[in-house]
């Protein structure tokens, strides 16, 4: 994605009909616009029918003309049509509205009218093609006006401080129960559904983390459908300091078993790519383009801190579960291209708690005592990260 700063104060959105011609051949579509709002964070997702490289521009506010600051995205090869003739009202204290129109005959334009602005982040994702735009409040204003749905998820007020990640205390843990609602996830032995395992483990993990003084936000506490973008929007909106996504694995090879922990990495084994394809909701053939996309990832403190977090959790699971469940296999620590980790701007970890397709693993994943033991070890690892590792990272900051 290319970036440029607009120098003109005018941003025209031309209605498709006024261009005087029928839709040109070979264009894709702007399929949908979604948004999620929180006090210090807003996310807009521009869904496209096919991948496209957008140009990003910024226009400062014009108080004399009563025009807000704007971010705009020119998306070549896209057609808008009439469905977006009316602006999409946001009104969350950060974004006023989203406007969509045809900039030229073969280029769509999406404009974000901004009320408050600190910084923004743009990510292009594939399968399905979409552009994810995150707008953050100014640091000194974070936690102010802005409404939004974070309150429904128990977001703590301090979570919007927006300090550099390696200077923030680790207080809020966001636990993401994978899949849910229309998406059952993997289905294994005896009809065991991944979405049921993840929800049970997430709720149990919440108890273990709270017992250690953490504030905990669940992305879902019931059987409901959530997109990957919404899961991480909940995490960002809650001011999460750590993001833990829990899943259950599956394989056509019934002998595969054990716990696996993943941090983000674009280069991965073929088996991990197949797993990432399932968790990302893309076909295996689409994972290699996904790898090329993730190859452009920024290398931030969050990435390094994710590895440190994973090592602590892995150590606790390996020692604690090995003592209490000697038949369970040694957990593996791996890396893979998971969207849910890419979309999070905080230390993030994805845990596959076992294989629903393995007889013994499936039996354990149905056992509340096993899930309690797993939750305890995960919580111990996060606690160790908070108390021992994170402070050392902050001390080493130049």
Q: How does the language model describe each region?
A:
Residues 371-386:
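Histidine-centered active-site loop/cap adjacent to the catalytic His
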Residues 148-311, 315, 323, 363, ...:
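Catalytic-core regions of hydrolytic enzymes
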């Amino acid at each position: 994605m290319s970036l440029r700063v607009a120098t003109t104060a005018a941003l025209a959105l031309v209605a498709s009909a006024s261009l005087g011609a029928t839709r040109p051949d070979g264009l894709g579509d702007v399929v949908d616009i979604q948004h999620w709002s929180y006090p210090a964070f807003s996310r807009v997702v521009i869904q496209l029918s096919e991948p496209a490289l957008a140009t990003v521009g910024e226009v400062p506010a014009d108080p004399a003309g009563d025009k807000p600051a704007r971010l705009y995205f020119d998306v070549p090869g896209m057609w808008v049509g009439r469905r977006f003739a009316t602006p999409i009202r946001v009104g969350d204290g950060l974004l006023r509205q989203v406007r969509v129109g045809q900039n030229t005959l073969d280029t769509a334009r999406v404009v974000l009218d901004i009320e408050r602005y600190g910084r923004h982040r743009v990510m292009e994702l594939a399968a399905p093609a979409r552009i994810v735009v995150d707008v953050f409040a100014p640091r000194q204003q974070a936690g102010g006006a802005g409404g939004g749905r974070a309150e429904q998820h128990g977001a703590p007020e301090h979570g919007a401080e927006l300090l550099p990640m390696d200077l923030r205390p680790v207080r809020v843990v966001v636990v993401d129960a994978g899949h849910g609602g229309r998406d059952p996830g993997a289905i294994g032995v005896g009809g065991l559904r991944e979405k049921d395992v993840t929800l049970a483990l997430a709720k149990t993990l919440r108890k273990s983390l709270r017992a250690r003084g953490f504030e905990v936000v669940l992305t879902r506490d019931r059987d409901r459908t959530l997109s990957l973008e919404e899961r991480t929007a909940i995490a960002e909106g809650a001011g999460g300091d750590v993001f833990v996504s829990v899943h259950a694995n599956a394989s056509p090879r019934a002998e595969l078993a054990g716990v696996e922990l993943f941090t983000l990495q674009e280069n991965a084994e073929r088996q991990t790519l197949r797993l990432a394809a399932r968790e990302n909701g893309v076909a295996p053939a689409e994972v290699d383009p996904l790898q090329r996309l993730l190859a452009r990832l920024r290398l931030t403190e969050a990435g390094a801190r994710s590895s440190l977090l994973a090592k602590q959790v892995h150590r606790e699971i390996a020692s604690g579960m090995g003592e209490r469940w000697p038949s369970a296999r040694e957990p593996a620590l791996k890396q893979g291209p998971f969207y849910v980790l890419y979309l999070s701007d905080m230390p993030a970890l994805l845990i596959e708690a076992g294989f629903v397709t393995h007889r013994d693993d499936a039996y354990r994943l149905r056992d509340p005592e096993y899930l309690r033991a797993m939750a305890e070890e995960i919580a111990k690892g996060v606690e160790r990260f908070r108390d021992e590792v994170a402070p050392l990272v902050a001390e080493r900051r130049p």
